[in-house]
């Protein structure tokens, strides 16, 4: 059976990491995805390369997506969080091999300044970026990731206040 004929729920999750990156004011980095016509804001995330630890993947992805690795890990999520992408997106993402992602999340303190951030990387994922408050984060996030973001916020919230 080819991946294109598999049912959505039969596909595995792609292993990955997500980063809740905080500035000195405890605002959260969000980027607007470059590959969609809708206003799709999200926190940086990415895959784990085979043999790579989640924490190493998080710092690599931070550099790849925001152009800076100026920061340090405050906390790692206790759980792996997962989300499913809408079925119409499956053939367009990851060669149709995954139903969504299962991610370890990291709370990262950004130690640089705004001038250190460069989203015009070799493989850009965002065309805009900004710092969002914890209160506004869930209202601007792409809907199919909202439940995952709620869980991540709940886990890290006491460390942000």
UniProtKB/Swiss-Prot annotation:
User: Any keyword Transport?
Assistant: no
Q: Which Gene3D superfamilies match?
A: Nucleoside Triphosphate Pyrophosphohydrolase (3.90.79.10)
Which InterPro entries does this one have?
Answer: NUDIX_hydrolase-like_dom_sf (IPR015797), NUDIX_hydrolase_CS (IPR020084), NUDIX_hydrolase_dom (IPR000086), RppH (IPR022927)
Q: What class of enzyme is it?
A: hydrolase
Query: Which cofactor does the UniProt annotation name?
Result: a divalent metal cation
PROSITE patterns found in the cross-reference section:
NUDIX, NUDIX_BOX
**Nudix hydrolase domain spans which residues?**
12-154
What Gene Ontology biological process does one annotation of this record name? mRNA catabolic process
UniProt xrefs under SUPFAM superfamilies: Nudix (SSF55811)
Q: Which GO terms describe its molecular function?
A: metal ion binding; mRNA 5'-diphosphatase activity
A Pfam family (short name) is NUDIX
Placement of sequence motif Nudix box: 46-67
Q: Which GO terms describe its cellular component?
A: cytoplasm
Q: Which UniProt keywords apply?
A: Hydrolase, Metal-binding
As recorded in UniProt, its EC number(s) are 3.6.1.-
Q: Which PANTHER family match?
A: M7GPPPN-MRNA HYDROLASE
Family statement drawn from the similarity comment of this UniProt entry:
Belongs to the Nudix hydrolase family. RppH subfamily.
Q: What does this protein do?
A: Accelerates the degradation of transcripts by removing pyrophosphate from the 5'-end of triphosphorylated RNA, leading to a more labile monophosphorylated state that can stimulate subsequent ribonuclease cleavage.
Q: What is this protein called?
A: RNA pyrophosphohydrolase
Q: What is the protein's species of origin?
A: Rickettsia africae (strain ESF-5)
Taxonomic placement: Bacteria, Pseudomonadati, Pseudomonadota, Alphaproteobacteria, Rickettsiales
């Amino acid at each position: 059976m080819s991946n294109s004929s598999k049912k959505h729920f039969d596909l595995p999750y792609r292993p990955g990491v997500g980063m809740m990156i905080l500035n000195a004011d405890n605002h959260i980095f969000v980027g607007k995805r470059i590959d969609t016509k809708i206003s799709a804001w999200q926190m940086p995330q990415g895959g784990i390369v085979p043999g790579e630890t989640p924490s190493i993947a998080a710092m690599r992805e931070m550099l790849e997506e925001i152009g800076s690795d100026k920061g340090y890990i405050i906390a790692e999520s206790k759980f792996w969080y997962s989300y499913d992408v809408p079925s119409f997106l499956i053939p367009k993402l990851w060669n149709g091999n995954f139903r969504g992602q299962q991610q370890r999340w990291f709370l990262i303190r950004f130690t640089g300044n705004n001038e250190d951030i460069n989203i015009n990387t070799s493989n850009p994922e965002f065309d805009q970026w900004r710092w969002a408050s914890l209160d506004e984060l869930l209202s601007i996030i792409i809907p199919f990731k909202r439940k995952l973001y709620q869980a991540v916020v709940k886990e890290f919230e006491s460390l942000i206040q």
